[in-house]
C-alpha cells in the first residue's frame, strides 16, 4: 500500500474519520510546541547520557527552530499544487521549487544560536551567515539530493534545521487529506519523499498504530507493524533493545534486507520524541552495526560522512 496526497474534493468514498475502522494514513505536522517539546526531551535525555553535550546542543537547535517558527510564519494555499501533481509527493524534496523563505529561517536560527553554542560551532555559524544566497542554495540542493559529502558536517546540521522547519511549515499548510491506494514505496514520506528518522507506536486516537516520522517535513505516515519498513517483507524481523523487553526504544531489524529502524513506544514512555530519542540511543545503533545491520534512516542532527 502506498499513500498519495489529494485535495479534499478528490477524495473517494473512504471510511468515515469517525468510523472504528478508519486509520489515518497521514498525520500532518502539528507545529504548536513541537520544537519546544523536543528541546525539553533532549534536555531530559541528556541526564546521565554519554552524549550529553551533543544532546544539549541539539536542544538549543530545537529552541532556535521554535523561535524562528514564531518570528517567520508561512501561510500558503497549496490547493493548486495538489491539483497539478498526481501520483507523486507534492513537496518532493528534490523537485519542489523552494522559496527563499528558508533563508530567513536560517538567519533566525543562526542569530539564536550564536550566544549559546560551543566555540567550535560558532565558526560554522559565522561562515554560514557570510555565505551568499547561491552558496546556501548549493548546499541545500546537495543535502536534499542526499549528497551529504558535499556539505561539511559542521554546516549541514544548521542548513537542515532551516530546511526542515521550512518543509514542516509547508506540510502544515496542506489542505488535502491522505488517500490510501495500492502500491509500494511506503519507506519514503508521501509528502516530501524524504526518509524517516524513526517509527513510533502511538497512543491516543491512534492507539497501537505504527507511524514513520519524516526527517524533513515532520509528517508521519502509517505502516503496519510486523512489516519491514524498508523492504516490506515480514519473515525475518527481530527486535533489539539495550535494557529490557519493556524498553521504550527498540531497533527493528530485517534479516531479508539487512536493515534496521528504531521503533519507539509511547505506551512505554509518553514523552518519546522521534528525533530526540533516536539521537539519544546511539549505543543501540552501534550494537546493530556490530550485528551486521545497516541503518535505513537518517537523523537530521547526525548526517552520514558520505
UniProtKB/Swiss-Prot annotation:
Organism of provenance: Proteus mirabilis (strain HI4320)
Keywords linked to the UniProt accession: Cytoplasm
Cellular localisation: Cytoplasm
Name this protein carries in UniProt: Protein FdhE homolog
Family: Belongs to the FdhE family.
Keyword hit for Phosphoprotein: no
Biological role: Necessary for formate dehydrogenase activity.
Predominant place of localization: cytoplasm
GO CC, one annotated term: cytosol
InterPro entries in the record: FdhE-like_sf (IPR024064), FdhE_C (IPR056796), FdhE_central (IPR056797), FdhE_N (IPR056774), Formate_DH_accessory (IPR006452)
Repeat found in the keyword field: no
Annotated Pfam families: FdhE_C, FdhE_central, FdhE_N
GO annotation, biological process: protein maturation
SUPFAM superfamilies: FdhE-like
UniProt GO MF annotations: ferric iron binding
